[in-house]
Every structure is written in C-alpha cells, then in structure tokens.
Design a protein with these regions (language model features):
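A short, N-terminal "cap"/entry segment at the start of jelly-roll beta-barrel domains
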Residues: 1-39
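Conserved short histidine dyad/triad with adjacent acidic residue
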Residues: 28-32, 39-57, 84, 91-92
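Short hydrophobic/aromatic-rich beta-strand segments that constitute the beta-sheet cores
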Residues: 54-55, 72, 106-109
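Short, conserved beta-strand element in jelly-roll/cupin
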Residues: 56-72
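Ligand-binding loop in jelly-roll beta-barrel domains
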Residues: 92-116
Length: 117
C-alpha cells in the first residue's frame, strides 16, 4: 500500500525565469511522481507582458489558468484568450504560442520528469 505525499503550500511561491526564452516567462516544478515509466509533474507557470513565447510540447500537458489572462494559440490557427478557470490540453507534438497584454498564471500537470520542460 502506498501512502499519499503532502507537498506543502505553493501559495506565493516564486517561479524562476525561463531564461531560454526571450519572454517574461517563469516556471517551476512543484512536485514530481516517482514513476520512472510514466512520470507526472505538477507546477506553476507565469507570463508577463512583453514578447510572446512559443513552445513545442514533447509530452502531454494540462494547464489550468488560475489568474490573469493569457492568449493561447496553436499552429492550426486556433487562438483563445484564456481567463481564470479555463482548462487546456496540449498533446505531445503541439506547438503553442503564449502571449499576454498584462500577466497570466497557470497550474500545469505534465506527463514528464523533473526539469524536462
């Protein structure tokens, strides 16, 4: 039998800059499963006004917008301005562009290991 793991509060946690992008983007992995075959990582993402950020997913991810507003567009031309409570699924292989006029925050769960974003 496996016991649950309490990871503590993530409220107010600082997110490090995603320096590999020319955007005001910040991301941190809060928790990672111990399953080496099918890892799951949960964390936070913040984007502030400035350059947009384009990312190609090499894993499946769900992202819930928890604050602010982020425009999310894919390479098929679909574009949605997301606000608090909006949920997205990004399949592996999808190319997504994130932008905002002010700021937005998301909580994500991805099928990847720690630091593989």
């Amino acid at each position: 039998m496996s016991a649950m793991q309490f990871k503590g509060s993530i409220k107010g946690r600082e997110l490090p800059a995603m320096d590999e992008f020319d955007a005001n983007a910040f991301l941190d992995d809060f928790a990672v499963s111990e399953d080496p075959d099918k890892p799951i990582t949960a964390g936070g993402f913040r984007l502030e006004a400035g350059q947009s950020m384009t990312y190609t997913y090499t894993y499946h991810e769900m992202k819930l917008i928890i604050d602010g507003e982020i425009t999310i567009a894919d390479d098929t031309g679909q574009s949605i301005t997301a606000t608090k409570g909006d949920l997205f699924y990004f399949p592996s292989g999808s190319t997504i562009t994130f932008s905002t006029e002010d700021y937005g925050m998301g909580y994500f769960v991805g099928q990847r290991g720690v630091g593989e974003a």
